[in-house]
C-alpha cells in the first residue's frame, strides 16, 4: 500500500504500478523554457499541450507533494461542461455570443478529454454517460424547468440540455421522491487519481520532467525559487489552485473552500439493477446545498457535498479533510436518496479544498512581457475546465492563434477577497443560505426568493 493511499477512495484503489516510483525533488538550479508550479490537472494539461505544440520545449513541473495530491486526485470524478460562473455573468462581461462560445468550448472539452485518454492509453474509468439532475420536489422541478428554458434562450437545444419526465428520470436513476429531472450528455465519470497519474506519465514520456516534494516559496518573472534550488524559465505557469494563498502576496487571491466525500463498499448487482445509473451518469438533486455523486467502475457510490467550514486565514491542513459532522450529513443525504443501500459500509471518508475567487470566475492569464502565466479558480468545476485552460495556456504561450485565446476568461482578473475577519465571517455566513433555502422549500413548497437573490448576488450570477 502506498503511503498516501489514505488520501481518498481514488488513491486507495490505485495499484502499485499506477502509483509508479516516487519522483525525486529538485536537487540543483535549473534552466528550462517553461516552469510549471503545481502537478495537478492544470499544470499537467498545460505541459501536455505545450509539448504537443512544440516537442522541443524544455518543461519542468514543480510539485510540493506528489502528482494528484490536491483536488485533482480527490474530486468527485465529474468531467463536466459546468462553469462556476453563469452564462449571464459571462455575457455581461463580454457578449451573449462569447458566452455561447465559451459554453460550447466546454461541451467540446468533455470529448477532448475522452480523446486524449484513449489516444494515450490512460486507464481512468472514463464513462461518457452524461449528467443527471434529479428533481425531488415540485419547486426543484420548476427551478430546473426555468434553467433549461434559460439555456435554450442562448440557443442550446434538447440535444444539450433536456427536461425529463418523472418516468424518464426514474429509468435513469431510481432515487426517492422523483418528480422529474434534467439531463445533459456533456459529462463523463472518471477515476480522478488515475487520470492525474496517467497524465503525468504521459507528459514525462513526451519529455517533461516532474519534480515532486519541491515546495515553491516564491514566483517571480522568469524565476521560481524553492528551498532545493532555483528554476529559471522564459515562462512560469502558476497552477496552484486552492494552495495559491500560501504564496507570498497571494493570501487573498482565492478562498480555499472544503468539499468532503464518502464512498460505500461495492454494492451488489441486484442493487444496481433496481437503482439504475447503468451508463454511470454523474448525478445530484435540485437542493441548494450542493451534493454530487457517481457510480464508480467498481460499483460503489462516491458521494460528496459542501457545508464544511472555511478556515481562518485561508489555511489548508490535513485535519480539515475530515469532519464527523459533515461526513455524517453526506451519508444521511445519500441514504435519503437511496434508502436501499441500507447498512452498506462507508469504506472511505475524505475531503479537500477547492479555490473560490471573490467573483466566482475562473481565469487564464499570460503576460508575455514578464513571462508569467496562471490558470485556476474553478470552484470545484475543474476536471473539465483544466483541460480547456491547459489548451488555452499552450496556445497563448506558443503564440498560436485559435478561438480559445479569445474566450472571455482570458485575461480576467478577480478582485481580492476581503481581509480577515470579514472573509471568515462572510464565507461561513454564506453556508447558512443554502441550508435555509432548502429548509424553507421543504416546509412551504415554495422557493426562498430572498435567499436565492443573496446567493446569486454574492457569487456574481
Please tell me what each predicted stretch does.
Residues 1-34, 52-58, 453-459:
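Extreme N-terminal leader/targeting segments of oxidoreductases
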Residues 38-44, 64:
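Glycine-rich Rossmann-fold phosphate-binding loop(s) that bind the pyrophosphate
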Residues 119-127, 216-218, 230-270, 274-370, ...:
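Active-site substrate-recognition segment that forms the wall
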Residues 51, 387-407:
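Internal hydrophobic alpha-helix adjacent to the cofactor/substrate pocket in enzyme cavities
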Residues 82-166:
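Dinucleotide-binding Rossmann-like beta1-alpha1 core, especially the glycine-rich loop
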Residues 51-74:
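Glycine-rich FAD pyrophosphate-binding loop
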Residues 319, 337-340, 357-362, 368, ...:
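Helix-rich C-terminal "cap"/substrate-channel and partner-interaction subdomain
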Residues 142, 149-154, 176-234, 239:
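Helical element adjacent to the flavin cofactor pocket in flavoenzyme catalytic cores
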